[in-house]
Curated annotation (Swiss-Prot):
Keywords for the protein's UniProt record, in alphabetical order: Cell inner membrane, Cell membrane, Membrane, Transmembrane, Transmembrane helix
Cited function: Plays a role in cell envelope biogenesis, maintenance of cell envelope integrity and membrane homeostasis.
PANTHER family: INNER MEMBRANE-SPANNING PROTEIN YCIB (PTHR36917:SF1), INTRACELLULAR SEPTATION PROTEIN A-RELATED (PTHR36917)
Membrane keyword on record: yes
Bilayer topology annotation: Multi-pass membrane protein
Family in the record: Belongs to the YciB family.
Any Pfam family hit: IspA
Name of the protein in question: Inner membrane-spanning protein YciB
Main location: membrane
Organism this protein belongs to: Rickettsia akari (strain Hartford)
Annotated signal sequence range: none
Amino acid sequence: MLKLLSEIGPVIAFFAGFFYGGGIQNATLYMLITSVICITLCYIIDKKVSKLSIISTTVLLVSGSITLISGDSMYIKIKPTILYVIFGIIFLMSGIRKTPFIKYALESIVRLKEESWITLSYRTAAFFFFMAVVNEIVWRNFSDETWVKFKVFGIIPITFIFIVLQLPLLLKNKLPDSKI
């Protein structure tokens, strides 16, 4: 539950900051503060923070700080693109190297044949590259308000759809002792 809150909390803070706190600068500030609080709580309670959370928070702190200092919202808008490309590269390289990173993230939930982890790595890489392109299209062609709404109400459903589309692969290739 804490991990879910640490992922969703900053997004909710960003949305609330934008629509109720006076725009993208305040939204960025609220998201930065919430992210630092969430990652700190994760560390205090779980005594660990995932590498992806560290990467995500670091990119957020850099892009968010530049946004606040410069007053230019472009930097916070390219943060998702940067993260999606980084994650896409991580999953692509782990597939190429036959050491699927996604296996370590999901192995406690589902156990799969090794070749299925590789396939899932490539699919996840493609998803992240696709999301990078979509983010670029939205922030470059639409208003701040549209981008914020997309960030909150578009990315989550798209991600959910991607996950659902992976279920046939997971169910077909799961090992007998898998939890799903």
